[in-house]
């Protein structure tokens, strides 16, 4: 099945073979394969990141068109600082340029933008653009677009536990009152529902320290397609796979049906 290019004026049209009642409300993506995509074409790795950014933009609009309410993208992990300095510098500059160029359009389309991760380690100019984009789009409701930058799930969970421990130490919280809900209040994603579906491209089949707490019951879809080549049809296939699954959240089917 072929689809027309995504455009801001394109009306919302869910493919006819997808059940609108079973569309996942929150999708998370691990965008893997930019470097391999570029290398296979004799291009520098940064060309893959540039094309990968276009793919993410298209996916965001597709999610919006098809009624998906939240998209979370793993853009830069805490481990990615170990990449060549030229590549890291390019990625930081790319993030900043994309925000400056795309913010107005996303704001008009009703996109709410959020960032999760340790943003304090990022260049000051990038932090400024991130703060501006989050502030300007805070009340938008068409789709919640979250980008994980300098993010590591173990760091996030450790940070949350440390904050809860400080509350207990200060006498503001009883140790007996600490539960999953309390910890979740101190995660970066406190105002976002857990992902229904994780998509990872390029054939890798691991979580890579991404949303470990939040994805306890998330369905996972792995594809060999490299991220820059992940188009509407590939996304459509991921959603078809998701809709064929029986989500039980740790229960047996009889209890869910009751």
Swiss-Prot record:
Binding residues annotated for Mg(2+), in chain numbering: 32, 219
Keywords: Magnesium, Metal-binding, Transferase
Catalytic activity, EC: 2.5.1.-
Residues that, per the record, bind substrate: 33-37, 45, 49, 77-79, 81, 83, 200, 206-208
Active site, per annotation: 32, 80 (proton acceptor)
Transmembrane segments: none
GO MF term list: ditrans,polycis-polyprenyl diphosphate synthase [(2E,6E)-farnesyl diphosphate specific] activity; magnesium ion binding
PROSITE patterns documented for this protein: UPP_SYNTHASE
NCBIfam families assigned to the protein according to its UniProt record, in alphabetical order: PRK14830.1, PRK14831.1, uppS
Subunit comment: Homodimer.
Protein's UniProt name: Isoprenyl transferase 2
Annotated source species: Nostoc sp. (strain PCC 7120 / SAG 25.82 / UTEX 2576)
Species lineage: Bacteria, Bacillati, Cyanobacteriota, Cyanophyceae, Nostocales
Gene behind this protein: uppS2
């Amino acid at each position: 099945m072929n689809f027309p290019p995504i455009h801001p004026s394109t009306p919302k049209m869910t493919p006819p073979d997808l059940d609108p009642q079973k569309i996942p409300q929150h999708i998370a993506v691990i965008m893997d394969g930019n470097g391999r995509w570029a290398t296979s074409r004799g291009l520098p790795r940064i060309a893959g990141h540039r094309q990968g950014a276009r793919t993410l933009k298209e996916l965001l609009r597709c999610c919006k068109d098809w009624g998906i309410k939240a998209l979370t993208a793993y853009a830069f992990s805490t481990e990615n600082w170990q990449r060549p300095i030229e590549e890291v510098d390019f990625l930081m500059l790319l993030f900043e340029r994309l925000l400056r160029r795309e913010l107005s359009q996303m704001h008009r389309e009703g996109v709410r933008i959020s960032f999760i991760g340790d943003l304090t380690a990022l260049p000051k100019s990038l932090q400024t653009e991130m703060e501006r984009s989050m502030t300007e789009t805070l009340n938008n409701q068409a789709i919640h677009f979250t980008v994980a930058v300098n993010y590591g799930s173990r760091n996030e969970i450790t940070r949350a536990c440390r904050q809860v421990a400080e509350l207990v130490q200060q006498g503001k919280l009883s140790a007996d009152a600490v539960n999953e809900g309390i910890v979740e209040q101190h995660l970066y994603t406190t105002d976002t529902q857990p992902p229904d579906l994780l998509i990872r491209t390029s054939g890798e089949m691991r979580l890579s320290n991404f949303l470990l707490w939040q994805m306890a019951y998330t369905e996972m879809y792995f594809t060999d397609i490299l991220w820059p080549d992940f188009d509407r049809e590939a996304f459509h296939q991921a959603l078809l796979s998701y809709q064929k699954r029986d989500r039980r959240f740790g229960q047996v089917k009889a209890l869910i049906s009751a």
